[in-house]
């Protein structure tokens, strides 16, 4: 795989994380750049590891991974998105609210895993090609770091406009990503 194909693959793989990061950034009360970078680093690290894991699994048992990865991603994203929607509906008026709580480490990791299962599936496919898997995984991770950090900062500006509805929107984005993963699996 040449450098152009690797870069296109890397940024293509980062789009789910970018969309999820916009939702995350919108639900926080004015996230700082350090929080955006933290999110980018977590998403980027997970997106670096998942193609490597997928590549290893592809060498061992690609059929099982390809049969189940879309369902795992779908369930995780529906759960996380549903949780965000419920929290958004339960919330009070924005004026009466304390500053929104920060997203915990494990919630970010879970979201990163859910949005990176497609990268794991790509890793399975890469196991059957002549590709430098380390360089490709690093490219995917770096692209995801950049796009997730950018997504959080974009979300920062959307959040105050939407208020508490941002959490509902973020949940809908995650559910939409899950549905898109399932749709793509069944309809190519």
Swiss-Prot record:
Free-text function comment from the UniProt entry: Probably functions as a manganese efflux pump.
Membrane spanning stretches: 3-23, 66-86, 106-128, 143-163, 168-188
Keywords tagged on the record: Cell inner membrane, Cell membrane, Ion transport, Manganese, Membrane, Transmembrane, Transmembrane helix, Transport
Organism of origin: Escherichia fergusonii (strain ATCC 35469 / DSM 13698 / CCUG 18766 / IAM 14443 / JCM 21226 / LMG 7866 / NBRC 102419 / NCTC 12128 / CDC 0568-73)
Keyword Ion transport: yes
Bilayer topology: Multi-pass membrane protein
Chief localization: membrane
Family label: Belongs to the MntP (TC 9.B.29) family.
Cell inner membrane listed as a keyword: yes
GO molecular function: manganese ion transmembrane transporter activity
One Pfam family hit: Mntp
Any GO CC annotation of this UniProt entry: plasma membrane
Location in the cell: Cell inner membrane
InterPro entries (UniProt xref): Mntp/YtaF, Put_MntP
Stated name of the protein: Probable manganese efflux pump MntP
């Amino acid at each position: 795989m040449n450098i152009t194909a690797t870069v296109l693959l890397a940024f293509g793989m980062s789009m789910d994380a970018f969309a999820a990061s916009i939702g995350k950034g919108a639900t926080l009360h004015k996230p700082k750049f350090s929080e955006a970078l933290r999110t980018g680093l977590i998403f980027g690290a997970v997106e670096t590891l998942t193609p490597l894991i997928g590549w290893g699994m592809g060498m061992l048992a690609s059929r099982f991974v390809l049969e189940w990865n879309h369902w795992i991603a779908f369930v995780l994203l529906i759960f996380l998105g549903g949780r965000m929607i419920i929290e958004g509906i339960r919330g009070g008026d924005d004026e009466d609210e304390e500053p929104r709580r920060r997203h915990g480490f494990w919630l970010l990791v879970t979201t990163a895993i859910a949005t990176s299962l497609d990268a794991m599936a790509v890793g399975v496919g890469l196991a059957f090609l002549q590709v430098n898997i380390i360089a490709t995984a690093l490219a995917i991770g770096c692209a995801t770091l950049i796009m997730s950090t950018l997504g959080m900062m974009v979300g920062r500006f959307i959040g105050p406009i939407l208020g508490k509805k941002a959490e509902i929107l973020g949940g809908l984005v995650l559910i939409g990503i899950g549905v898109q993963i399932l749709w793509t699996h069944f309809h190519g």
